Regions:
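Beta-propeller domains with acidic blade repeats across secreted/periplasmic ectodomains
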Residues: 1-198
């Protein structure tokens, strides 16, 4: 009998058991967009599948020039320059090779903000001379704790502030109130880690 993770096709449902990553690791092409359930008047197209040395992709963001930045699960960021109609990749380049599992990417305020889960921190990357290379990396906020439910997505608020979403593997920052139900304290007195937004 074939192993469950080798069974084609890779279709993910609402109640998937979180094993799709194992099944996806055996595929050579991304999921067929024809299998997606989309709202009316929306469409999905496959532009590119991950190449052999590009690993698994965990997040993406577009810069002001329409280039796509993709974070690899292990480490590093890849930038794809797309054709004018956005249907082909014209250029592929590594723009960072040391930040680990960047689950959150956000272009804002002339910089790329990166929530690097396995690097345990939020960073700002800047291109200070306009040559397309991030030549300045600044640690903005380090966080202790695990990585399973770790440092996740970033969002730009209507107030132009950047919000980082952290899961319950990450320790609460000092001075932050724990707003979980006081009833659960009877069974679990205090946890250093709790899901939060900073």
């Amino acid at each position: 009998q074939e192993k469950w993770w080798a069974l084609p096709p890779l279709i993910i449902g609402e109640s998937d058991d979180y094993t799709q990553w194992k099944r996806a690791s055996n595929l050579e092409e991304a999921t067929d967009p024809a299998t997606f359930q989309l709202l009316p008047n929306y469409r999905a197209e496959l532009i590119r599948s991950a190449g052999k040395n590009e690993g698994s992709w965990v997040s993406m963001a577009f810069d002001s020039q329409g280039r796509l930045t993709v974070a690899r699960e292990d480490k590093g960021l890849i930038r794809y320059t797309l054709s004018e109609d956005s249907r082909k990749v014209l250029r592929t380049e590594i723009i960072n090779d040391d930040l680990k599992e960047c689950r959150g990417l956000l272009y804002a305020h002339g910089s790329l903000y990166v929530n690097a889960n396995n690097s345990n921190a939020l960073y700002r990357l800047r291109d200070t001379n306009g040559d397309g290379v991030f030549d300045h990396k600044k640690l903005l906020h380090a966080s202790k704790g695990g990585s399973g439910h770790g440092r996740n997505d970033l969002a730009l608020g209507s107030d132009q502030k950047i919000y980082a979403i952290h899961g319950d593997s990450v320790h609460l920052p000092k001075g932050m109130s724990d707003r979980t139900s006081p009833l659960r304290r009877k069974f679990n007195p205090f946890r250093e880690n709790e899901g939060h937004v900073i």
